[in-house]
From Swiss-Prot:
GO terms for cellular component: cytosol; dendrite; nucleoplasm; perinuclear region of cytoplasm; plasma membrane; postsynaptic density membrane. It comes from Mus musculus. This is Proline-rich protein 7. The lineage of its organism: Eukaryota, Metazoa, Chordata, Craniata, Vertebrata. Residues 146-269 are annotated as: Required for apoptosis induction. Disruption phenotype: No visible phenotype. Mice are viable and fertile. T-cell and B-cell development are normal. T cell receptor signaling and activation induced cell death appear normal. Small reduction of CD4 single positive thymocytes. The keyword rRNA-binding does not apply.
Length: 269
């Protein structure tokens, strides 16, 4: 069977289309592979930099003790103090003030490079302090809340963040807090208790319903008016004691004696 020219052209186009599509897919897969590999290398490089920074952090802390606050002085090296301790003990030979009549002679220093050593720091300052344990007095901006390490090491917990936001002076309101609490409690005591009386007690049943406007009817008869006034006097409130102490209910065909407040939609048809 011989293929016609049209069939040959169709098969050639079909094969070429799928071949080009396959090459595009392979190219996309290769690009994604390269991107993932570059991203992995970048993450490894960042991880190595972080590890190096963590390893060099103690050295930086030891070097930064020279610029620490005045109360925190770096301790002297221990080997130097051990070597110079006996020399320092022999050099200080004092004469009794009653036996000495004249200017005090200078102390003889047997070692030419000897000089006075500073006083050793207290034992609680011998350990190099952490950077977050420095006092915050040197900082200019006190409106920022403390970091997590400072909040953990603080003797008193920091004020809530709402107080920091409402503070207009830029300082924590630790001193003003008790006065504010007293003033708020006084204001709460001065406020009258809320009244729980129901609404629309002296109005009709349809006063809470928004009905379309209609032509006003004629004036009712005086008997109905007297009955309405009497029902208003009989049921002034919702309390059971007043309901039991009043006269019995006289049913009226045109309105309810006690108005019930209605809000929203009703089920009336």
């Amino acid at each position: 069977m011989v293929m016609s020219q049209g069939t040959y052209t169709f098969l050639t186009c079909f094969a070429g289309f799928w071949l080009i599509w396959g090459l595009i897919v392979l190219l996309c897969c290769f690009c994604s592979f390269l991107r993932r590999r570059l991203k992995r290398r970048q993450e490894e490089r960042l991880r190595e930099q972080n590890l190096r920074a963590l390893e060099l952090e103690p050295l930086e802390l030891e070097g930064s003790l020279a610029g620490s606050p005045p109360g925190l002085a770096p301790p002297p090296p221990p080997h130097r103090s051990r070597l110079e301790a006996p020399v320092h003990a022999h050099s200080h030979v004092h004469v009794h003030p009653l036996l000495h009549h004249g200017p005090a002679p200078p102390h003889a220093h047997p070692h030419p490079h000897h000089h006075a050593l500073p006083h050793p720091p207290p034992p609680h300052l011998a350990v190099p302090p952490r950077p977050w344990s420095y006092p915050r007095q040197a900082e200019s901006d006190m409106s920022k809340p403390p970091c997590y390490e400072e909040a953990v090491l603080m003797a008193e917990p920091p004020p809530p963040y709402s107080e920091v936001l409402t503070d207009t002076r830029g300082l924590y309101r630790k001193i003003v807090t008790p006065f504010l609490s007293r003033r708020d409690s006084a204001e709460k005591q001065e406020q009258p208790p809320p009244s729980y009386k129901p609404l629309f007690l002296d109005r009709g049943y349809t006063s809470a319903l928004h009905l379309p406007s209609a032509p006003r009817p004629a004036a009712p008869c005086p008997a109905l008016c007297l009955q309405a006034e009497r029902s208003r006097r009989v049921f002034p409130s919702w309390t059971d004691s007043e309901l039991s102490s009043r006269e019995p209910l006289e049913h009226g065909a045109w309105r309810l004696p006690v108005s019930i407040p209605l809000f929203g939609r009703t089920t009336a048809v």
